[in-house]
Amino acid sequence: MMPATLAGLALAVTVATMFAQRVDSTTIHHVSGLKGKPLLFGPSLRRTLPAGGTFKWVLVLSDPCAPKPTEICVSVGHCFYDLVSSDNDSECANKDRRVLTLALLTKSKTGELRVIGPMAASSALVGDAGELEQLRRRVSAGMGLTDDGDISFAAADKVNEGLYGVRVMGSGDSYTFFNVTVATETAGDDRDLATVRHVDIAHNIVPSEDRDHVFVSMPRMHVAWPHGTTVLHPKMIIAAASWRPEYNFTYEWYAVPYDGYCATMRLFEACLYHPSAPACLDPAGHRGCVVGTMTHDDLVGRVLMARCRGSDLRTCEPHVIHIKQKPMVSLGRAVPELRVESAAHIPSLYILVVKIDDSVAGWAYTELMAEGSSPRVVIDIHMPRPTSAQGGIAALREIENDDSAPSLGSNEGGGPGNSKRRAAVLGAAVWIALTLLILGGLGAYVAVNKKCLRDKRQWLRGSRKPTLETHAHTYTSLPVGGDLSLEQDAEDEDEDEEELLYERERRRSSSGSKKSSRSPSRRSSRRNSFGPTLSANALSRFDKTVKLAMAEVAGRLLANKTFPSQRY
């Protein structure tokens, strides 16, 4: 047995006891110590590791892109610590994590741990192997391993700080991490290891037995049968909280077609928990290569499982809420099985989401592909970049369905597809503005014309005057001025009689001239009989009367300022 203090053993037991309280995420423990004092941490895997089992210790190198322990809350009262990578996606998106392997151990048949050495390199390592070896020696200086497989430092130093991880090889379990910090010892501090070394767990993590646990898994890839039915059969285990005698949950199937040009299919896990986030509604990148918030068009089926008791899903009462007819899909007998007919074999990413109380409790995905290559699915734990500066242009989502070329494997918003999409948005805005301008101009023109016509009609009604017929063939009466006396009226009557006699004689004489050859004596006698009655004075008065009448008519016309109409 390697040398260890009694306090170290007691703390190792404390750490082992602490591991009985686990969370459904990457387990992270916070370890702090004093500079120059002994430090011990680890899960004591020798006690639980079967014979022949192997596990390894790693150190996540300090880097701007390295993941950092962060408290994450998925619901009220359900918070845990997990590793969160840097938000600087532009620099860290395609950068591998620098992980340094410290030790690789195996358990023999006799129950002892044997160090089979740190590996010279790992597939996850980036950098020169010689540089990494020097770094390993510097970090492991003063580091030892206990019989239980824990890490110990005889005198902790600042160089020993970092994020240490341990994982059992081949078990499928995730890493258990220890976030180690070393504080500087103050003067007069004589605290021992038992009081200095401690493990802090977030106080608001709900114990595992007091909340729901959902486990969902299925193969990452399915090859579609050309002339048959493809069955998607995930494994789902639900362990409800102890205070739930009965519970309801829903499971939803989504099918997101992917573009054949995509080198990778990027699925943003954060959008499953925050579907209304603006960046998830309109993530940057080509629509066929990026999955943010899944829409109703992507929904294939939704089933409500009511009045479930315990973990036996056969006690639930299924209620199909939604099932899509195209593509041809149907629910299988087992929950949550999905059957996809051959007619619906479109290369797609099928996603299963399980919700309890409208909160996402678990999810899984698989690729349904035809024979041949398929894009590599990348699960991104970050929030996506929004297409616009404000993000979430939900009203223009239909414009994304253009025929623009995809941005292959890109997580940025400046690819060819986004440039064409922005050009389409700008063109649509210009056309809308021009249409509104033209319609507004036409409306103003019609309104002005209507007003002008209305004003003109009112002016014509108010200024219309009666017209005089000055071009008739015969006057029926002549206007007489108001200054004429009664005596003149009597004289006018006499003159009128004389004028009538004169007019008759003139007509007879004009007609008789044509017959002068037949009756010359008769025409001569008539002229002699009427001649003495028409004196020169009568002719003078008649001429004066005609002139007065004409002057009166002209005066009235000028006074009224009315232009007579002409009728023929």
Curated annotation (Swiss-Prot):
UniProt motif Internalization motif: location: 465-468
Main subcellular location of this protein, as a coarse class: virion
Annotated glycosylation sites: 88, 179, 248
Disulphide connectivity of cysteines: 271-280
Keyword Cell cycle in record: no
Key words of the record: Disulfide bond, Glycoprotein, Host cell junction, Host cell membrane, Host endosome, Host Golgi apparatus, Host membrane, Membrane, Signal, Transmembrane, Transmembrane helix, Viral envelope protein, Viral penetration into host cytoplasm, Virion, Virus endocytosis by host, Virus entry into host cell
Compartments (UniProt record): Virion membrane; Host cell membrane; Host cell junction; Host Golgi apparatus membrane
Highest taxon of source: Viruses
Family recorded in the similarity comment: Belongs to the alphaherpesvirinae glycoprotein E family.
Function: In epithelial cells, the heterodimer gE/gI is required for the cell-to-cell spread of the virus, by sorting nascent virions to cell junctions. Once the virus reaches the cell junctions, virus particles can spread to adjacent cells extremely rapidly through interactions with cellular receptors that accumulate at these junctions. Implicated in basolateral spread in polarized cells. In neuronal cells, gE/gI is essential for the anterograde spread of the infection throughout the host nervous system.
Name of the protein described by the UniProt record: Envelope glycoprotein E
